[in-house]
A protein has these predicted regions:
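Proteins enriched for Cys/Gly/acidic motifs involved in redox and nucleic-acid/cofactor modification
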Residues: 3-6, 10-233, 241-243
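S-adenosylmethionine
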Residues: 236
Length: 247
């Protein structure tokens, strides 16, 4: 069943943003992408498939190998080709590994390093407003555009609300939870410590809180993940153990 939502706006930056995400690389990236999606939904934006037309394409990149670098570039270029007027956002480890070179890539409009992912909504909206500061011009030059999004009833109960997307997440019974980030080993062959920074562990009370939130959404299986998971707790010199979570 199709629901038709009529959206009229005076300026492009005032309307609901349709944002498409693509995640490359590790499960930590997957977790962080989910967190970013939630932030945009809370801000009232609408998440669409990467294969759909979107206002913003956000690629959470990887740099662990040369192949990962190439894949990251390919996906960013594909997004730009899909919609040349869209805002193309690159974040993730590939951005941190080659930012100076990345900035010469005309396919990408905004680069967000890993340590700025928490501010992703603010950064993207600022770039969006700057990118489309001029009023939308229709073919006849009128600065008012009316468009119809055709969205299936299963996809949303309210455009941009995010409630139904959360409900879709609740239908899944497995989720990833990042409890550790970074690495202090600096192996000669590995770039990860340089793009993910030093070892940090999420405090156990925070882990427990997130686990409870996931359980409340119907998640039955949680996979703990990290960049160097076996080093969890070493950074606070307490060597905290996941056994503390038992019970």
């Amino acid at each position: 069943m199709e629901q038709h939502f009529y959206i009229k706006w005076m300026r492009k930056e005032e309307r609901i943003m349709r944002i498409a995400f693509l995640t490359l690389g590790c499960k930590v990236n997957s977790y962080e992408t989910d967190k970013m999606k939630n932030k945009f939904m809370e801000a009232g934006d609408y998440i669409v498939s990467f294969e759909e037309e979107a206002d913003i394409y956000l690629v959470n990149t990887c740099t662990v190998t040369n192949i990962a670098d190439r894949k990251s570039r390919q996906m960013l270029h594909r997004a730009k080709k899909k919609n040349p007027q869209a805002l193309i956002v690159a974040t993730g480890c590939y951005v941190d590994s080659a930012l100076a070179k990345d900035e010469q890539d005309e396919s990408v409009d905004l680069f967000v390093p890993n340590d700025q992912k928490n501010a992703i909504v603010t950064l993207v909206k600022q770039a969006w407003q700057q990118n489309v500061a001029d009023a939308v011009q229709s073919e006849n030059g009128v600065s008012i555009e009316e468009k119809v999004w055709q969205i299936s009833g299963e996809e949303t109960g309210r455009v941009g609300g995010g409630e139904s997307l959360m409900a879709q997440e609740e239908e899944h019974t497995r989720a990833y939870l990042t409890v550790q980030n970074g690495c202090n080993l600096y192996c000669s062959y590995c770039i990860i410590p340089y793009v993910r920074g030093p070892l940090t562990s999420k405090p156990i009370p925070q882990v427990v809180q997130e686990l409870k939130q996931m359980a409340a959404k119907g998640i039955r299986e949680v996979v703990l993940t990290g960049i160097h998971l076996s080093s969890y707790g070493v950074d606070d010199r307490k060597a905290s153990s996941f056994l503390e979570l038992k019970g």
